[in-house]
Amino acid sequence: MRILLLLLQNILVFCQFLQTIKVGLMFSKDTASVIRSVGYRTSAAAVLVAKDRIRAEHLLDQYDFNFTIKFDECSESLAAGKVVELLTHDNVDVIIGPTCNRAGVAVASLADFYNVPVFQWGLTTTADIGNFSRYQTTVTLSLDTHSISLAVREILRQYGWSEFVFIYSNDGDEEKCAAMKDDMEKMGIENSDVTMAYMIQIQTVTMESLQRTLLEVSKRGRIIIACFASGRGFKKAFIASTVLAGMSTEEYLYVFAEPQSRGFYVDEADGKVHYSWDDTDGQLVTGLTNEQIRDAYGKVLYICDNMGEPTTITTQYTNFTSQVISRMAEQPFNCVQDCSNQSYKHAATYAGQLADSFYAYAFALNKSLTQDPTRSNLKNGSFVLSNIGMTFQGVGGEAVTLDESGSRIVQVYMFAMNSSLLPYMAASLLVNVSEVVFTPFYKSESELWSVRPLSRPKCGFTGLECPADFVKEYLVYTIIAAFIVILALLAGCAGLLYTMHMKRKEMERQDLLWQVAFVELQQVQSKSRAEASMHSFASGPSTSTKMTVESRTETTNFIFYHYHQEVVAAKKHDLLVLFDANQKSEFRQMRNFDNDNLNKFIGLCLDGPQLLSLWRFCSRGSLSDVISKSSMQMDSFFMFSLIRDISNGLYFIHSSFLKCHGQLTSRCCLIDDRWQIKISGFGLKSVRTFENPKKEDLLWASPEYLRNEDQERLPEGDIYSFGIICAEILTRSSAFDLENRKEKPDVIIYQVKKGGHNPTRPSLDTGETVVINPALLHLVRDCWTERPSERPSIEQVRSHLNGMKDGRKTNLMDHVFNMLETYASTLEEEVSDRTKELTEEKKKSDVLLYRMLPRMVADKLKLGQTVEPETFEQVTIFFSDVVQFTTLAGKCTPLQVVTLLNDLYTIFDGIIEQNDVYKVETIGDGYLCVSGLPHRNGNDHIRHIARMSLGFLSSLEFFRVQHLPAERINLRIGINCGSVVAGVVGLTMPRYCLFGDAVNTASRMESNGKPGQIHVTAEANRMLTQVVGGFRTESRGEVIIKGKGVMETFWLLGEESGYTAPSKAAPKVIQHRQSIRSISPILEKNAEGSETSSLSVDQAGDNNSETV
């Protein structure tokens, strides 16, 4: 005993000092296309098996594991969000998953940024994820498409095939074949001895599209490599199409090269496999027998991993898959009910990779911690993966080898059909980075084919390349060739002349687009006195609201016109210029500019009193005026959106033929009615060359331009101007805050031009009211550095700005409206809040009222109207009672009784919602329902009640008491048809009650029924069998009913097709220990002479009914 106590003490001390490794697991749970291969319910427990192995091998003995599970559903955006939660909220040390390509790329990118190790598995087959130079913290154990392409290249070399055709389709799987296509295309480009002669994509796989494609391919190649989605019957249809197209001869060879493949086999839902030619998934009508298609498979090779051959699955792997399924009920998955479906009884195809991935991580981490045991190294992806080189035995018994870069050295196999038309493993290919070792398992190539196919037939693909008789053909060919040459020359000359003519016409047409006639311009008429001192056409009296164009008629620099029912701003140019062809080309291209953050260039007016350049009018003015005159406060999101808009517009300009703006100021940044920045004033270099810039515009000019105004404007100068504009936005003041400085613009310009170690720049004091990202301030300072070479490019600026996003996707216009609403009167807000609260409370009260009373009755009571009693000539009344409920309740606490009834009645309520049935009362274990009121439904009331009753009994087969799983619930049900009177009784607590002898009779049917049986009256039986039909009943015979005498009653057995009630031998129920009769507010007259009964809250039961 003393030794045992010491041992327990040591264990407790050991546990207290265990550190926890937080493991993030990412799965796809409900994506139907990947459930069989990587589904959560059939693979997640593999980490527990791997954990046991880690413990058995004494890896990471000082650490325990804590698992956090996220479901990405193979969605790129969802995976990105979930991995951010894991990294920032859950603070995991490693991520295992995800299992799909697009999600995998998103997670690998983020993990590389956070330097957290990621081990991916399953369907992550794209070569991008395995690119260690790109994702240095990600390891994948999946067979990727790059390895497959290398194996294909080696097979082509082995058999002397220099060219091939690639056919693929993304129908049914948008990831697998798209990745395969990229690597096959890359392989064909990078290898001079292997050429991809033709590649074609089939958008929608049908027998017609397959045959059309094959006929086209027959003109391009004989070695055909194909990739299709698995589990859709596409491969079978493709091979069938080769037969129908006459291409299943020895001349052709078809290679299915793809990851996630089972080779000649197809998975079934029960975990078994069958041959591909027997595939019935998504079966396309081929018109051929399976035997005919099987014969055509003799011209097929499969390149895949050892999952393509069921005979390679070891006993060790079979035991592993059994553990995966059985341990899903353990922590942290606790998947019992959700995993109970029969389709989840077999482990996912790639569950073994999950276990191997987790073990590889533990192996690498253990080795890393041996070198440096500091805690920070747990999630240091670069450090952990520096020891990723390893070789270990996988769960399936095969050797798993990773090199120092984390790339898996994979073993790929070539499968073929033998002479007996049965699949066999023909060769293996060991793929190590770029080297492939080919090992054939056959003794002679005759086992593969009688004659090796040629990549190019001797007479060509059309059979016309064999030399013909020169003497016979020479004269005819010469005449035809000469004729063709003459026609070609004539056609070429005519085509050239026509092209030149059309090009000249097109240029003239496009020139007409930017040349605006002065007569087409109608000057805007002012409604009021013209605004004075408008220093730019974008300025205005207020930017809080949209300004009317009538307030803008003419300024010093601009005139405002109507042109084609659109308001335009015409900039005045006091010069006349004759434009050459290059300048006209510039105007044509500017006219075609279409970007959300560039103001539309309309054109030039050359025939007016002076030269005018026309631009689209922006109603909210310029950014300069918004900053200087707006009374609306800008928050950080508003500022960031404005800066981002400017960077996007500037990026478009720098990427275009213009290369730079040259005169970027905040006055050029216009704001439209959606609060979006539109950069204006770009281009027109030939016009600006002869114009002197205004002094105040030089506040945005770069120092190098101020020192030499004759030099050409460069993109670096735009970046400087961008920095000045950003300072205006962040400080909500003009450039260099002239209003609050003593210096005049000339002095500031001189100081900027002078430069020095501490050059003059605007202040970046943003105040305390707005929180600005410090990284944004650093970026602004980088933009206005003295040396142009040290300033970031616009691409770098955009990249930095994208990195500063806070994850919000709010539109700026919506944000502005939110700001305006925020600054609305407090009275309006309070009224709105109170109105919302009142509406919500009204909704809650309505929901509660509609649960207590029928909607039409409740609506009348709400309106203060009297609900008159109403007679319903024919309805069906339903009573039920839980058998031996008192005995069952005696084994439960009061709270457990409530939970039991809540679970049971929740199921019943769901069944009621599927039928036109009104639930009157539930008191204790009693249940009263009626159909045919308050809405009359003809004779359908008996059908709805019957189906509901059958549904109740059917649901009990799967219902389990949570705290007493061995116990079973059984019901006794009674049904009667007849007339009733329904009305509302009471004022303080009004109840919708039923009155009539039919109610009492239905209650007697229940109390005189048997467990698990539906007891119906003769009238109900007549309605079921003669009126509505479709139900099976059985006569019980004559029964003495209390208060009714002798009655013939019946059992409802079920519908003609559908659920059937259990046999009369009811299942064993809880032993009756005591009988407690409880009658709630029920009006039940003397049982012997009662002609009318009423029921408001409970049923009138017999001695064998219990209520708790």
From Swiss-Prot:
Subcellular location: Cell membrane
Signal peptide from the UniProt entry: 1-15
Pfam families: ANF_receptor (PF01094), Guanylate_cyc (PF00211), PK_Tyr_Ser-Thr (PF07714)
Cytoplasmic side: 496-1108
Binding-site residues for ATP, renumbered to this chain: L489, L490, A491, G492, C493, A494, G495, L496, L497, K571
TM spans (from-to): 475-495
InterPro entries for the chain: A/G_cyclase, A/G_cyclase_CS, ANF_lig-bd_rcpt, Cyclic_nucleotide_synthase, Kinase-like_dom_sf, Nucleotide_cyclase, Peripla_BP_I, Prot_kinase_dom
Region Disordered: start-end pairs: 1083-1108
Tissue expression from the record: Expressed asymmetrically in ASE left (ASEL) sensory neuron. Expressed in excretory gland and canal cell.
Top-level enzyme category: lyase
Reactions the enzyme catalyzes: GTP = 3',5'-cyclic GMP + diphosphate
Keywords: ATP-binding, Cell membrane, cGMP biosynthesis, Glycoprotein, GTP-binding, Lyase, Membrane, Nucleotide-binding, Receptor, Signal, Transmembrane, Transmembrane helix
Membrane topology: Single-pass type I membrane protein
Side of membrane Extracellular, spans: 16-474
Enzyme Commission (EC) number: 4.6.1.2
GO-annotated cellular components: plasma membrane
Sugar attachment sites: N66, N131, N319, N341, N366, N380
Biased composition, class Polar residues, residue ranges: 1089-1108
GO biological process, one term: cGMP biosynthetic process
Gene Ontology MF annotations: ATP binding; GTP binding; guanylate cyclase activity; peptide receptor activity; protein kinase activity
Domain Protein kinase: start-end pairs: 483-803
Gene3D superfamilies, A to Z: 3.40.50.2300, Nucleotide cyclase, Transferase(Phosphotransferase) domain 1
Main location: membrane
Family stated for the protein in its record: Belongs to the adenylyl cyclase class-4/guanylyl cyclase family.
Functional description taken from the UniProt entry: Guanylate cyclase involved in the production of the second messenger cGMP.
Name assigned to this protein: Receptor-type guanylate cyclase gcy-20
Organism: Caenorhabditis elegans
Gene that this polypeptide is encoded by: gcy-20
